[in-house]
Amino acid sequence: QYGDYGYPYQQYHDYSDDGWVNLNRQGFSYQCPHGQVVVAVRSIFNKKEGSDRQWNYACMPTPQSLGEPSECWWEEINRAGMEWYQTCSNNGLVAGFQSRYFESVLDREWQFYCCRYSKRCPYSCWMTTEYPGHYGEEMDMISYNYDYYMRGATTTFSAVERDRQWKFIMCRMTDYDCEFANV
């Protein structure tokens, strides 16, 4: 299933049940190794600990056809307590996340770490269903389709539950260079 990548799904980078990248109420910065992109997002919610979540991510190398990332950057901050929609600018793919927790809002601000691959362009984009399915539930998003890449997300925020639901924006990438600055 993941033959293009040269190693099976079980060997995702740092992806295990107990390997959280943050403690509750704690900020974190997570970046995939160079040349890899985020392919899985896992999270558990804890109402008693500030209605916060612990997070874990998995990365996978992009296929050789995409080449090496030509540049990487942190996107604009998405504010705590707000609903938002963001894709990586400049046709970038998501290769990491950065987040800070705000006690006053019982929520987090978010930033995507994005990498651009030469002049490749996204197409055939779609949005996943909500993760988690209901506020407060465990979240486990795995991209089983290895020719689709995460380009961003849209989130809703519940003022009652103080939790967020995510829909991830997944796209294919062209096999050729194209001239569009941003899609």
UniProtKB/Swiss-Prot annotation:
Q: What is its main location?
A: secreted
Q: Where in the cell is it found?
A: Secreted, Extracellular space, Extracellular matrix
Which cysteine residues pair off into disulfide bonds?
A: 32-59, 72-114, 88-115, 121-178, 125-171
Region 3 X 6 AA tandem repeats of D-R-[EQ]-W-[NQK]-[FY]: which residues?
52-168
Q: In which tissues is it expressed?
A: Detected in skin, skeletal muscle, heart, lung, articular cartilage, long bone and calvaria. Smaller amounts detected in kidney. Not detected in brain, liver or spleen.
Q: What highest taxon heads this organism's lineage?
A: Eukaryota
Its GO CC terms are:
extracellular region
Ranges occupied by sequence repeats: 8-61, 52-57, 62-117, 107-112, 163-168
Mind telling me how this protein is modified after translation? Sulfated on tyrosine residue(s).
Keywords, ordered alphabetically: Cell adhesion, Disulfide bond, Extracellular matrix, Pyrrolidone carboxylic acid, Repeat, Secreted, Sulfation
Q: Which residues carry this modification: Sulfotyrosine?
A: 5, 144, 146, 148-149, 176
* Pfam families documented for this protein: DERM
**2 X 53-55 AA tandem repeats: annotated segments:** 8-117
Q: How does it assemble?
A: Interacts with TGFB1, DCN and collagen.
Q: Which family does it belong to?
A: Belongs to the dermatopontin family.
What function does the entry list? Answer: Seems to mediate adhesion by cell surface integrin binding. May serve as a communication link between the dermal fibroblast cell surface and its extracellular matrix environment. Enhances TGFB1 activity. Inhibits cell proliferation. Accelerates collagen fibril formation, and stabilizes collagen fibrils against low-temperature dissociation.
Q: What is this protein called?
A: Dermatopontin
Organism equals Sus scrofa (Pig)
